[in-house]
Structure formats: C-alpha cells, structure tokens
C-alpha cells in the first residue's frame, strides 16, 4: 500500500487555507472553553481531551470520562468533532510533508500500515465506497479514528472534498450516539442501578449480535479485493 504516499499533493495555497483555517477553529474553541469554564475546569477538560490523541483512547472511553467530570454535552460533541476534523484536514492536505517530520512521520507510517491491514480485514469498506467509510468512522469498536479513516480514504484515492464531509458526519453521529447513550445510562443509574446494568448488558448483546449478522450475511456481499 505504498501508493498512499504519492496520492493528492495540493498546492501551497490550498494547504495554507485549510490548515490555518482548521487550526484557527481549534484555537477559537479552546478560547471559548476557557472563557466559559475558567481555570480549574478548563485545565481538567483540556487534559482529558488531550488523552484522545493517545493510542487506545477513543470516543467510547473519552466520553464517559468527560461526562463523569461534568463536561456539558455540547462541549464534548464540539470538542471531539473539531479534534477529528483537525487531524483529518491536516493529514489530508499535508500528508507528504508530515511524513518528513521526525516522530510524526514514523507515527503516520505506522498508521498507514495499520490502515492497509484494516482495509484488508474489512474489504466491505472499499465495496461500499463513501458509505463504507462513514460506517467505519461511525462504528467505535472497529478501531476506527479520524486518522485511520483519513488514510484509508487516501488508499482508496478519495478526494478530500468527498472524504472530509464523510469524516465530519461520521464523527458527529458517533459522538452523539455515545454521548446520548452515556447520558441515558447515568439517568438510569440514578433511578435504579440495576436498570443501568441491564441496559448496558442488553445493548452490548444487541451490538454483538448485529455485528455478527453483518459480518456473516451483509459485509461479504460488498467485499472487494483490496490487493
């Protein structure tokens, strides 16, 4: 999958517009968080959001923590979506340049190898094209992330003008789904802890059953050779 390194190299103007634009949005969001929450809460929230960049931490682990420390739903959703879009845009428009930066380049090469493996393991992503990328971004327990989804998009030669809206919608829907689910479980817990436990178990069972049915009956119909 080395061809990913040679796909889509935009001009300098395009790189600057999109890169500076999304970094400005990120800076405005951080400033707004500081104005709204002040010093102590701001430090706690930003520290937890920073963990989102660490391997193994996704929406399904970050959102419950953010909810537990009292972060409002709007801040959680906006923060995760902006972080996802920041990563997606920077990688989409600067992939070849980022590869040359020590540390970052090594991490991107590792992510590219992981993306190629993921695409091989889930060929339906290619078969379903844009819908496949959306589903991959949306389903949290597949090991998906903005980084992996963006690189898979490059592997499939999907232009950023198509890929970025897919990542945005997938990130927004996934974040809202997890956040609303966590809020519902917390509400059930305060009503009766057993309700919350039963709800989590039933939800987990339903998800596993649906995933198994998808793998067995639906995904093979859309699988395409990724070699």
Regions found by a protein language model. Give the residues of each.
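Transmembrane helix boundary and interhelical junction motifs in multipass membrane proteins
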Residues: 47-74, 140-150
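Transmembrane alpha-helical segments of integral membrane proteins
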Residues: 146-151, 173-184
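Membrane-helix boundary/interface segments in integral membrane proteins
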Residues: 23, 27, 123-126, 146-161
């Amino acid at each position: 999958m080395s061809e990913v390194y040679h796909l889509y190299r935009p001009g300098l103007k395009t790189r600057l517009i999109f890169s500076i634009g999304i970094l400005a949005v990120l800076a405005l969001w951080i400033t707004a968080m500081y104005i709204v929450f002040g010093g102590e809460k701001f430090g706690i929230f930003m520290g937890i959001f920073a963990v989102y960049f660490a391997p193994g931490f996704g929406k399904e682990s970050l959102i419950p923590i953010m909810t537990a420390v009292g972060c409002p739903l709007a801040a959680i959703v906006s923060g995760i979506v902006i972080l996802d879009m920041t990563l997606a845009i920077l990688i989409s428009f600067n992939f070849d340049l980022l590869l040359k930066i020590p540390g970052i380049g090594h991490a991107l090469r590792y992510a590219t190898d992981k993306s190629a493996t993921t695409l091989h393991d889930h060929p339906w992503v290619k078969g379903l094209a844009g819908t496949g990328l959306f589903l991959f971004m949306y389903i949290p327990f597949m090991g998906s992330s903005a980084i992996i989804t963006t690189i898979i998009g490059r592997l499939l030669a999907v232009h950023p003008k198509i890929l970025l809206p897919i990542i945005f919608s997938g990130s927004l829907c996934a974040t809202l789904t997890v956040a609303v689910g966590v809020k519902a479980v917390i509400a059930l817990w305060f009503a009766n802890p057993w309700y919350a436990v039963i709800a989590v178990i039933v939800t987990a069972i339903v998800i596993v059953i649906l995933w198994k049915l998808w793998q067995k009956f639906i995904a093979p119909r859309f699988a395409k050779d990724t070699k």
